[in-house]
């Protein structure tokens, strides 16, 4: 099933926009409203599975927290394992970490050292692409473990914020179901 204009419009209409959240001047795109609609949620997963079903994916990685909500069902649909990337000290086994820059300061992500095997063909899934910093750090973790990652899938791409261009410089092809201007 290739996404039709009608299906994509249905998904886009399931996203609520909240003005001035979390601060004045921001138009927040709330993906949780899509999750509240089982038809929209199921369709978003079906479309991502359809796109990647013949891509030879061996693992799906999702970044905390909403990446879990989309990545895990995509992994099930593809018949492959799901690997969570989390904030520090949330994973119980041995991990490696990657620090990345935020607008004001830094943050860190971790992955289990045994979750990705050398040669794994990994798809990164997250709810939203903005500046790309979180996904860039996720890609670095996967590659440090020997995984191959060339694709990342998103429900929403805030295309004005430069995330897609940032990830393309890292050799990542980005796909999103819904582009929105970023604010």
From Swiss-Prot:
InterPro entries: Ade_phspho_trans, Adenine_PRTase, PRibTrfase_dom, PRTase-like. It catalyses: AMP + diphosphate = 5-phospho-alpha-D-ribose 1-diphosphate + adenine. Homodimer. Its EC number is 2.4.2.7. PANTHER family: ADENINE PHOSPHORIBOSYLTRANSFERASE (PTHR11776), PHOSPHORIBOSYLTRANSFERASE DOMAIN-CONTAINING PROTEIN (PTHR11776:SF7). Pathway: Purine metabolism; AMP biosynthesis via salvage pathway; AMP from adenine: step 1/1. It is found in: Cytoplasm. The keyword NAD does not apply. GO terms for biological process: adenine salvage; AMP salvage; purine ribonucleoside salvage. This is Adenine phosphoribosyltransferase. Signal peptide: none annotated. Belongs to the purine/pyrimidine phosphoribosyltransferase family. Keywords: Cytoplasm, Glycosyltransferase, Purine salvage, Transferase. It comes from the Bacteria.
């Amino acid at each position: 099933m290739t996404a039709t204009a009608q299906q994509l419009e249905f998904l886009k209409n399931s996203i609520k926009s909240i003005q001035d959240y979390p601060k004045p001047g921001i138009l927040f795109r709330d993906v949780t409203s899509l999750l509240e609609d089982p038809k929209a949620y199921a369709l978003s997963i079906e479309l991502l599975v359809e796109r990647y079903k013949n891509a030879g994916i061996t693992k799906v990685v999702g970044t905390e927290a909403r990446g879990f909500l989309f990545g895990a069902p995509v992994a099930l649909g593809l018949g492959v394992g799901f690997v969570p990337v989390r904030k520090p000290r949330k994973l119980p086994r041995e991990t490696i970490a990657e620090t990345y820059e935020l607008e004001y300061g830094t943050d860190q992500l971790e992955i289990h050292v045994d979750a990705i095997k050398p040669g794994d063909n990994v798809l990164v899934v997250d709810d939203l692409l903005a500046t790309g910093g979180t996904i860039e750090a996720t890609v670095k973790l996967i590659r440090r473990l020997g995984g191959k990652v060339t694709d990342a899938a998103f429900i929403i791409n805030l295309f004005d914020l430069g995330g897609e261009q940032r990830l393309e410089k890292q050799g990542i092809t980005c796909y999103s179901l819904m582009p929105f201007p970023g604010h």
